Amino acid sequence: NDWTLMIVTADVSGKGVPASLIMAEVRASTQLLVSMKVGLVELTEKLNALIHQSTDKKSFVTFFAAEINPVMRSISYVNAGHPPPLICSNGAVSPLSRGTFPLGMQALLSGLTVRDAAFQPGDFIVFYTDGILERTNPQGEQFGEERLAGYIRKNARSGVGPFVEQLFAEVEKFGEGRDPDDDATVAIIRFV
């Protein structure tokens, strides 16, 4: 409806042209299915079937889709193997549900359910890909969800632009100049 915002974050295993082609297929299919007004579970199940049929079974896609209703102050979401977004409310940071297997790994997704969460003005959600969590330093340590949650708590009052810029700088600093093993994406939704 007019009051609902949909956000999707996804990440394809692998690199290069094959991964790019899979992501293009996911993006186009998601846009088509959303325009057909399918629900979150049906959207995810149809994408899973498509990816399972059209890939080599070694490729998979982590996928998180959410419908945000600012009037009801609610978020409904499904998670297929994607790192759970972190919601910050009054300085407390907690993950949304981890969900089920990534898309394409199995012909049918078992245990896929719509979850719900509420938010208040001032809360925000951080959506990200595993390139943030899996950034390693020379000692082999990963940046991880705990460091990310700590960063969110420490910088909760920052504007969205500076928050994201500083997060990437923090992750880069943690890597101590090493090239990242994976790309990274971050998106923020702040509720007013």
Where would I find each of the regions flagged by the language model?
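Conserved subregion of the PPM/PP2C metallophosphatase catalytic domain
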Residues: N1-S13, V17-A24, A28-V192
